[in-house]
């Protein structure tokens, strides 16, 4: 596709809850990918995410586009909540990446991240672009919150 917009709590996700491996998410949008905002009805943030909550390995998120924009709490991530290994996040944006803003109702920061909140190892975060903008509370992050690597 040329343009992909995920808005108002919309999500693309690949999850694993047990011992099996999670699937991968590949996004190819020649012009732009936008991940924007929160839905007060569902309480969800707009997100492209691969996550594992069990012992299985999480999938990867690979985005190829001209411009990636994550605003008002929107984000792209791979996260581990279990003992499995996290997937990798790779963003190839030929023009620019912009990450900015905090969604005021949920206080969710816009983010590009790979992280672990349990015993599993986090994956890597790779960003390739000509112009990177991080502003107004936006965050690019790799982190370990618990005993993971």
Language-model segments: which ranges?
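Extracellular and secretory-pathway beta-repeat/beta-biased strand scaffolds
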Residues: 1-149
């Amino acid at each position: 596709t040329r343009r992909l917009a995920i808005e108002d709590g919309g999500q693309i996700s690949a999850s694993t809850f047990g011992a099996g491996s999670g699937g991968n998410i590949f996004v190819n949008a020649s012009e732009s990918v936008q991940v924007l905002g929160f839905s007060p009805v569902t309480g969800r943030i707009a997100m492209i995410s691969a996550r594992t909550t069990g012992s299985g390995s999480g999938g990867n998120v690979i985005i190829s586009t001209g411009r990636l924009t994550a605003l008002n709490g929107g984000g792209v991530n791979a996260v581990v909540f279990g003992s499995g290994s996290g997937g990798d996040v790779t963003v190839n944006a030929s023009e620019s990446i912009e990450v900015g803003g905090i969604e005021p109702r949920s206080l969710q920061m816009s983010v590009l991240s790979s992280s672990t909140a349990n015993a599993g190892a986090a994956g890597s975060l790779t960003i390739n672009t000509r112009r990177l903008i991080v502003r107004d509370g936006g965050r690019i992050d790799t982190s370990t919150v618990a005993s993971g690597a």
